[in-house]
UniProtKB/Swiss-Prot annotation:
Presence of keyword Transmembrane helix: no
Membrane topology field: Peripheral membrane protein
Name assigned to this protein: Cytochrome c oxidase subunit 5B, mitochondrial
GO cellular component, one term: mitochondrial inner membrane
Organism (species): Thunnus obesus
Taxonomic lineage: Eukaryota, Metazoa, Chordata, Craniata, Vertebrata
Function: Component of the cytochrome c oxidase, the last enzyme in the mitochondrial electron transport chain which drives oxidative phosphorylation. The respiratory chain contains 3 multisubunit complexes succinate dehydrogenase (complex II, CII), ubiquinol-cytochrome c oxidoreductase (cytochrome b-c1 complex, complex III, CIII) and cytochrome c oxidase (complex IV, CIV), that cooperate to transfer electrons derived from NADH and succinate to molecular oxygen, creating an electrochemical gradient over the inner membrane that drives transmembrane transport and the ATP synthase.
């Protein structure tokens, strides 16, 4: 996930979203 909590392509594919 990005600094703004937006999931990357990989995270969208896996359903993960890392928020800082």
């Amino acid at each position: 996930g990005t600094l703004k909590g937006i999931p990357t392509d990989d995270e969208q594919a896996t359903g993960l979203e890392r928020r800082t």
